[in-house]
A protein has these predicted regions:
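C-terminal cap/substrate-recognition subdomain and adjoining C-terminal extension
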Residues: 93-107, 114-244
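Alpha-helical substrate-recognition element adjacent to the catalytic core
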Residues: 2-137
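A general, composition-driven signal for non-globular sequence regions
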Residues: 1-2, 156
Length: 244
């Protein structure tokens, strides 16, 4: 496996890793190497989904409005969709990272602006039934698919308000955010520390805003960081991981 053969850049984590903390982990592009929702749309949706995507990119639609219009365009039957999800890999080191968290009693929650059905299918296929999932709810009916937003909040453009979820999940502890994209940027403001996938929008946002963060290539990097001695006092390292 590539992750176990690559020389790791070990970076220090802040002091709170020895205290009570909770891990909030994104899914699409974080737990998986690519955005699963976009891959499903690309493969199975009417081509007009791209026009809706462009409207979102231009700022004319919120992320929630965008997904609400795109998901009904998916034409795959449930069995075909399941077969597609069976082929979706997880990012190198994620399975090992979940085992590490479980062995240390570290609360790990998947909080995603994607589809709960796809997330659970992929996690369950890898034997990870125990991980809590907070995501938009995919509804299947005779007429097709639609999305519900049980974790949305008025005034939040996302389907899942990650800030609201984190305030509950990590109410009595520090919040460690692991993510990659735009849906993670708001939570990065209040998270105690952020692990941002190298070269993605979350990394750029944290750097521009001066939020405490470090980059990673895969979950083997994160595992190495957790196992490394915590420096005293903590200081943000200047080193950046190599480009992908």
């Amino acid at each position: 496996m590539q992750g176990s053969q690559t020389k790791r850049t070990v970076f220090p984590l802040p002091e709170f890793v020895e205290e009570s903390y909770a891990v909030i982990c994104d899914f699409d592009g974080t737990v998986t190497p690519f955005d699963v929702t976009d891959a499903i749309l690309e493969r199975f949706a009417h081509p007009s989904w791209k026009t809706i995507e462009d409207e979102w990119v231009q700022g004319n639609l919120s992320a929630r409005e965008c997904m609400e219009r795109q998901i009904p365009l998916i034409g795959a039957k449930p069995g075909v969709l399941e077969a597609f999800l069976d082929e979706v890999p997880v990012t190198d080191g994620f399975v090992e990272f979940t085992r590490f968290c479980r062995s240390r009693d570290i609360p790990l929650t998947i909080v995603s602006d994607g589809m709960d059905y796809a997330i659970r299918h992929i996690l369950y296929r890898h034997g990870m039934h125990h991980i809590p999932v907070v995501a938009n709810r995919l509804i299947r009916s005779r007429t097709g698919y639609q999305l519900e937003f049980p974790y949305g909040r008025e005034g939040c453009p996302s389907g899942v308000c990650k800030c609201s979820v984190a305030s509950i999940v990590a109410a009595d502890s520090k919040c460690l955010l692991i993510g990659d994209g735009l849906s993670d940027c708001c939570l990065a403001r209040s998270a105690s520390f952020t692990l941002a996938r190298h070269g993605k929008s979350l990394q750029r946002h944290c750097a521009e805003q001066g939020f405490p963060h470090q980059t990673y290539l895969d979950f083997f990097d994160i595992l190495e960081a957790f196992k490394a001695p915590v420096p005293q006092p903590y200081a943000m390292p200047a080193a950046v991981l190599p480009a992908v």
